[in-house]
Amino acid sequence: YRDVRFSKDKSPYKTDAAAWFYHRDAWHAVCTAAVHGGAGFYFQIAPKENIVAGGIWMPPGEALKTLRLAIANNHEELRAILKAPAFRRAFGALSDEAVLKRAPVGFDPEHPAVDLLRYKSFTVSQDLTEAELLSPKLPDICAKKDATMLPLVRWLNRLLGLPPHSRRLRRAGAAGRR
């Protein structure tokens, strides 16, 4: 909320609507400094900026350290996800909005995965056209894009100790609560 009664600039504080879908086991950790909310999916509608995105954006220090250590030890798995033909067609590469210029502290600048270790966020996104946004098939369009991101999201969550979600787990959990 932005009080604009006495302001010359009457533009609203926020001009977009967004939704973040994160791991079911991470709900208690969202927006806390000590713990991360895990990787997930993001949907945004804004003037001239409608996107579907996924991954983990600016994780706290401990989560970022965990991810970097895992990448340093097994970067081939992440590279395989990023080089998958469907993934490359849809997203190209990881977003480069938050990348260090040099290797992070504690990592060898000559490490074969230094290009991946420099990332501070592990996200991908794709713009939605106005036709897609206004289409009655928008949920299907987003689901298809999210399915393409799913290997990255699952890989990140697995490294952070969040197991993959499945219908079987959901049914078993619901049955146990009755």
Labelled PLM ranges:
Residues Y1-F21, L78-R79, K101-S121, R178:
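Short, Lys/Arg-enriched charge-dense amphipathic segments
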Residues R2-N73:
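Aromatic- and glycine-enriched beta-alpha-beta binding-site module
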Residues K8-K10, K14, K48, K65, ...:
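Context-gated lysine
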Residues I45-F107:
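Compact, glycine/acidic-enriched structural inserts
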Residues F91-R178:
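Long, solvent-exposed, polar/charged low-complexity segments
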